[in-house]
Protein backbone atom coordinates (compact mmCIF):
# COMPACT_ATOMS: atom_id res chain seq x y z
CA UNK A 1 0.00 0.00 0.00
CA UNK A 2 1.36 3.44 -0.82
CA UNK A 3 2.46 5.27 2.32
CA UNK A 4 0.30 8.38 1.74
CA UNK A 5 -2.83 6.20 1.59
CA UNK A 6 -1.86 4.31 4.76
CA UNK A 7 -1.21 7.57 6.61
CA UNK A 8 -4.48 9.10 5.41
CA UNK A 9 -6.56 6.11 6.44
CA UNK A 10 -4.85 5.82 9.82
CA UNK A 11 -5.57 9.53 10.32
CA UNK A 12 -9.19 8.96 9.29
CA UNK A 13 -9.58 6.15 11.85
CA UNK A 14 -8.14 8.38 14.56
CA UNK A 15 -10.53 11.20 13.64
CA UNK A 16 -13.46 8.76 13.60
CA UNK A 17 -12.56 7.66 17.12
CA UNK A 18 -12.42 11.29 18.23
CA UNK A 19 -15.80 12.10 16.67
CA UNK A 20 -17.33 9.02 18.32
CA UNK A 21 -15.70 9.59 21.70
CA UNK A 22 -14.02 6.20 21.44
CA UNK A 23 -10.85 5.32 23.33
CA UNK A 24 -7.68 4.97 21.26
CA UNK A 25 -4.67 2.99 22.38
CA UNK A 26 -1.48 3.17 20.36
CA UNK A 27 1.75 1.28 20.73
CA UNK A 28 4.97 0.39 18.94
CA UNK A 29 7.36 -2.47 19.62
CA UNK A 30 10.56 -0.39 19.47
CA UNK A 31 9.74 3.16 18.34
CA UNK A 32 13.33 4.35 18.80
CA UNK A 33 14.67 1.40 16.81
CA UNK A 34 14.21 -0.19 13.41
CA UNK A 35 10.40 -0.04 13.51
CA UNK A 36 10.43 3.72 13.93
CA UNK A 37 7.89 5.92 15.71
CA UNK A 38 4.13 5.88 15.29
CA UNK A 39 2.49 7.65 12.40
CA UNK A 40 2.15 11.18 13.88
CA UNK A 41 -1.21 11.75 12.18
CA UNK A 42 -2.79 9.28 14.60
CA UNK A 43 -2.21 11.34 17.73
CA UNK A 44 -2.79 14.57 15.79
CA UNK A 45 -6.32 13.36 14.96
CA UNK A 46 -6.91 11.62 18.30
CA UNK A 47 -5.23 13.82 20.92
CA UNK A 48 -6.95 11.75 23.62
CA UNK A 49 -5.10 8.61 22.46
CA UNK A 50 -3.18 6.70 25.11
CA UNK A 51 0.28 5.54 24.11
CA UNK A 52 1.53 2.33 25.71
CA UNK A 53 5.29 1.77 25.52
CA UNK A 54 6.36 -1.77 24.80
CA UNK A 55 9.67 -3.41 25.52
CA UNK A 56 10.16 -5.02 22.13
CA UNK A 57 7.26 -7.48 22.08
CA UNK A 58 6.22 -7.99 18.46
CA UNK A 59 2.64 -8.94 19.37
CA UNK A 60 1.18 -6.00 21.29
CA UNK A 61 -1.05 -8.48 23.13
CA UNK A 62 2.07 -10.01 24.70
CA UNK A 63 2.63 -6.74 26.57
CA UNK A 64 0.75 -6.73 29.89
CA UNK A 65 0.50 -2.92 29.97
CA UNK A 66 -1.13 -2.87 26.54
CA UNK A 67 -3.64 -5.56 27.48
CA UNK A 68 -4.40 -3.75 30.74
CA UNK A 69 -5.01 -0.50 28.84
CA UNK A 70 -7.45 -2.30 26.53
CA UNK A 71 -9.25 -3.93 29.47
CA UNK A 72 -9.42 -0.58 31.30
CA UNK A 73 -11.57 0.85 28.49
CA UNK A 74 -14.34 -1.57 29.43
CA UNK A 75 -14.96 -2.21 25.74
CA UNK A 76 -15.46 -5.72 24.38
CA UNK A 77 -15.37 -4.67 20.72
CA UNK A 78 -12.07 -3.55 19.23
CA UNK A 79 -11.17 -1.86 15.96
CA UNK A 80 -7.59 -2.73 15.07
CA UNK A 81 -5.12 -1.54 12.43
CA UNK A 82 -1.37 -1.85 12.21
CA UNK A 83 1.60 -0.80 10.16
CA UNK A 84 2.08 -4.33 8.82
CA UNK A 85 -1.14 -6.27 8.27
CA UNK A 86 0.37 -9.72 8.80
CA UNK A 87 2.10 -8.79 12.06
CA UNK A 88 1.08 -5.53 13.75
CA UNK A 89 -2.61 -5.96 12.97
CA UNK A 90 -2.99 -9.75 12.84
CA UNK A 91 -1.15 -10.87 15.98
CA UNK A 92 -3.02 -8.71 18.54
CA UNK A 93 -6.33 -9.12 16.68
CA UNK A 94 -6.11 -12.91 16.83
CA UNK A 95 -4.97 -12.80 20.48
CA UNK A 96 -7.86 -10.50 21.45
CA UNK A 97 -10.41 -12.79 19.78
CA UNK A 98 -8.94 -15.72 21.73
CA UNK A 99 -9.67 -13.75 24.92
CA UNK A 100 -13.30 -13.12 24.01
CA UNK A 101 -13.16 -9.76 22.24
CA UNK A 102 -15.06 -9.00 19.04
CA UNK A 103 -12.38 -7.62 16.73
CA UNK A 104 -12.76 -5.65 13.52
CA UNK A 105 -9.54 -5.38 11.51
CA UNK A 106 -9.29 -2.37 9.23
CA UNK A 107 -7.41 -3.80 6.30
CA UNK A 108 -6.96 -0.67 4.19
CA UNK A 109 -5.55 1.21 7.20
CA UNK A 110 -2.95 -1.50 7.72
CA UNK A 111 0.13 -1.70 5.55
CA UNK A 112 1.37 -4.66 3.61
CA UNK A 113 4.26 -5.46 1.35
CA UNK A 114 2.52 -7.78 -1.11
CA UNK A 115 -0.89 -8.85 -2.29
CA UNK A 116 -0.06 -12.45 -1.35
CA UNK A 117 0.86 -11.46 2.22
CA UNK A 118 -2.43 -9.61 2.57
CA UNK A 119 -4.47 -12.51 1.19
CA UNK A 120 -2.78 -15.04 3.48
CA UNK A 121 -3.28 -12.74 6.46
CA UNK A 122 -6.95 -12.18 5.60
CA UNK A 123 -7.54 -15.94 5.49
CA UNK A 124 -5.73 -16.40 8.80
CA UNK A 125 -7.55 -13.66 10.73
CA UNK A 126 -10.97 -14.60 9.36
CA UNK A 127 -10.42 -18.23 10.40
CA UNK A 128 -9.55 -16.94 13.88
CA UNK A 129 -12.80 -14.96 14.09
CA UNK A 130 -11.60 -11.46 13.22
CA UNK A 131 -14.00 -9.44 11.05
CA UNK A 132 -12.24 -7.59 8.20
CA UNK A 133 -13.46 -4.11 7.24
CA UNK A 134 -12.27 -1.09 5.34
CA UNK A 135 -12.03 2.46 6.64
CA UNK A 136 -15.10 3.64 4.73
CA UNK A 137 -17.24 0.89 6.27
CA UNK A 138 -16.00 1.79 9.76
CA UNK A 139 -16.79 5.46 9.15
CA UNK A 140 -20.24 4.83 7.70
CA UNK A 141 -21.26 2.33 10.35
CA UNK A 142 -20.23 4.63 13.20
CA UNK A 143 -21.50 7.86 11.60
CA UNK A 144 -24.94 6.35 10.94
CA UNK A 145 -26.48 9.56 9.52
CA UNK A 146 -25.55 12.84 7.85
CA UNK A 147 -28.24 14.52 9.94
CA UNK A 148 -25.86 15.53 12.72
CA UNK A 149 -24.14 18.70 13.85
CA UNK A 150 -20.66 17.38 13.09
CA UNK A 151 -21.50 16.35 9.50
CA UNK A 152 -18.80 18.64 8.07
CA UNK A 153 -16.18 16.89 10.20
CA UNK A 154 -17.39 13.53 8.91
CA UNK A 155 -17.15 14.85 5.36
CA UNK A 156 -13.52 15.68 6.09
CA UNK A 157 -13.00 12.09 7.25
CA UNK A 158 -14.24 10.81 3.89
CA UNK A 159 -11.80 13.07 2.04
CA UNK A 160 -9.00 11.20 3.84
CA UNK A 161 -10.47 7.89 2.70
CA UNK A 162 -11.46 8.99 -0.83
CA UNK A 163 -9.37 12.05 -1.80
CA UNK A 164 -11.60 12.76 -4.83
CA UNK A 165 -14.55 13.13 -2.43
CA UNK A 166 -13.11 16.56 -1.63
CA UNK A 167 -14.51 17.78 -4.98
CA UNK A 168 -18.04 16.80 -3.94
CA UNK A 169 -17.59 18.49 -0.57
CA UNK A 170 -16.40 21.69 -2.23
CA UNK A 171 -19.37 21.62 -4.61
CA UNK A 172 -21.81 21.02 -1.77
CA UNK A 173 -20.24 23.78 0.36
CA UNK A 174 -20.51 26.24 -2.54
CA UNK A 175 -24.15 25.28 -3.12
CA UNK A 176 -24.88 25.90 0.56
CA UNK A 177 -23.19 29.32 0.36
CA UNK A 178 -25.30 30.24 -2.69
CA UNK A 179 -28.51 29.35 -0.86
CA UNK A 180 -27.42 31.03 2.38
CA UNK A 181 -26.45 34.25 0.57
CA UNK A 182 -29.60 34.27 -1.60
CA UNK A 183 -27.44 34.36 -4.72
CA UNK A 184 -28.82 33.70 -8.15
CA UNK A 185 -27.44 30.80 -10.08
CA UNK A 186 -25.86 31.70 -13.41
CA UNK A 187 -28.72 29.82 -15.09
CA UNK A 188 -31.21 32.10 -13.31
CA UNK A 189 -29.62 35.38 -14.37
CA UNK A 190 -31.21 37.38 -17.18
Where are these regions (language model features)?
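Short linear motifs at secondary-structure transitions and domain/linker junctions
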Residues: 1, 26-28, 80, 107-108
Amino acid sequence: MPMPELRARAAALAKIATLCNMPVITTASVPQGPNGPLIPEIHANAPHAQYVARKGEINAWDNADFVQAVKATGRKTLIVAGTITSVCMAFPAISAVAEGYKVFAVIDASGTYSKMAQEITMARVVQAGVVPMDTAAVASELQRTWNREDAAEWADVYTKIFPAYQLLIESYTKAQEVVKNNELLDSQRA
